[in-house]
Regions:
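Short, Lys/Arg-enriched N-terminal segments with co-localized hydrophobic residues
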Residues: 1-12
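Conserved Rossmann-like nucleotide-binding pocket used by diverse enzymes
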Residues: 12, 36, 61-63
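A short beta-strand-turn-helix
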Residues: 13-30
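Conserved helix-turn-beta segment immediately C-terminal to the redox Cys motif
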Residues: 27-30, 47-65, 71
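Short pre-active-site segment immediately N-terminal to redox-active cysteine/selenocysteine motifs
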Residues: 29, 36-39, 81
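Conserved redox-active cysteine motifs that mediate thiol-disulfide chemistry
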Residues: 35-49
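Non-catalytic, surface beta->alpha helical segment in thiol-disulfide oxidoreductase systems
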Residues: 87-115
Length: 115
């Protein structure tokens, strides 16, 4: 696995900390951040869904923020429930998906944001 929130060749999402989160969301490329918690059942279901989707999008940054550890990031971004997937570009939120959704919804969203 790679550090700083990058996904490895197996597309496993890394845990973002405050530093890696700030670095990645400010990049010019699309960054997907999954806000989740260890106690959240739907968050656990979402992980393999996103890993599968991300195989088709190797050129985006992707990572996860554990809201129990980094509640400051969740509060800053107005996260009110998990799972929530937020898309950033150049440090700006460009879209958000709340709740567990099918893989196709995430793929379509990423496609629309990359065009």
């Amino acid at each position: 696995m790679l550090k700083n929130g990058l996904i490895n060749k197996n597309k496993v999402m890394e845990q973002f900390d405050s530093t890696s989160y700030q670095e990645k969301i400010k990049e010019d490329k699309l960054t997907l951040v999954k806000y989740a918690a260890n106690w959240c059942g739907p968050c656990k279901v979402l992980s393999p869904i996103l890993e599968g989707v991300l195989k088709d999008f190797p050129n985006i940054n992707a990572g996860e923020v554990n809201i129990d550890i980094h509640s400051d990031l969740a509060i800053k971004d107005g996260i009110r429930g998990v799972p929530t997937v937020v898309f950033y570009k150049n440090g700006v939120v460009v879209d958000k998906m709340v709740g567990l959704q099918p893989a196709q919804a995430y793929s379509q969203k990423i496609n629309s944001l990359m065009n």
